[in-house]
């Protein structure tokens, strides 16, 4: 099994080493019920407009698994989790190399750690 693990690391390493893109979330730590949560993800080490990538928002409620919120393409095309669609807006600002999440009418059920991802 050690040999297999080592082999898998070798195969995966080149793509990992070449991937210099970093994403950093920013926004308020707390939002009151009924308010709108606004988060921004800043992309560094590469252009948000280059490559065939979808830029996503994901969240993880305490003690639960990951929940996909939605994604956006640099052109502005979006797709949202149907269960959140009525409250979610994801937008992109290519001039700032950022994409953003707005989640309206938050409740205790929206308590989670929010992540941006490519």
UniProtKB/Swiss-Prot annotation:
GO terms for cellular component: extracellular region; immunoglobulin complex; plasma membrane. Residues 20-118 form the Ig-like domain. Disulfide bonds join 41-116. Its main location: secreted. Residues 55-71 are annotated as: Framework-2. SUPFAM superfamilies: Immunoglobulin. Residues 72-78 are annotated as: Complementarity-determining-2. Residues 20-44 are annotated as: Framework-1. One of its GO terms (molecular function) is antigen binding. GO terms for biological process: immunoglobulin mediated immune response. Gene3D superfamilies: Immunoglobulins. It is found in: Secreted; Cell membrane. Residues 45-54 are annotated as: Complementarity-determining-1. InterPro entries: Ig-like_dom, Ig-like_dom_sf, Ig-like_fold, Ig_V-set, IgHV. Keywords: Adaptive immunity, Cell membrane, Disulfide bond, Immunity, Immunoglobulin, Immunoglobulin domain, Membrane, Secreted, Signal. Residues 117-118 are annotated as: Complementarity-determining-3. It comes from the Eukaryota. V region of the variable domain of immunoglobulin heavy chains that participates in the antigen recognition. Immunoglobulins, also known as antibodies, are membrane-bound or secreted glycoproteins produced by B lymphocytes. In the recognition phase of humoral immunity, the membrane-bound immunoglobulins serve as receptors which, upon binding of a specific antigen, trigger the clonal expansion and differentiation of B lymphocytes into immunoglobulins-secreting plasma cells. PANTHER family: IMMUNOGLOBULIN HEAVY CHAIN. Immunoglobulins are composed of two identical heavy chains and two identical light chains; disulfide-linked. This is Immunoglobulin heavy variable 4-30-4. It comes from Homo sapiens (Human).
């Amino acid at each position: 099994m050690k040999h297999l693990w080592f082999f898998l690391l070798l195969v995966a390493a080149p793509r990992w080493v070449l991937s210099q893109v970093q994403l950093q979330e920013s926004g308020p730590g707390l939002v009151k019920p009924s308010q709108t949560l606004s988060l921004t993800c800043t992309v560094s080490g590469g252009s948000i407009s280059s490559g065939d990538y979808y830029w996503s928002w994901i969240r993880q409620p305490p003690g639960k698994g990951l929940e996909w919120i939605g994604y956006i393409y640099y052109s502005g095309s979006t797709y949202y989790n149907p269960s959140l669609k009525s409250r979610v807006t994801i937008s992109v600002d290519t001039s700032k190399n950022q994409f953003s999440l707005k989640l309206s009418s938050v409740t205790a059920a929206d308590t989670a750690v929010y992540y941006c991802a490519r």
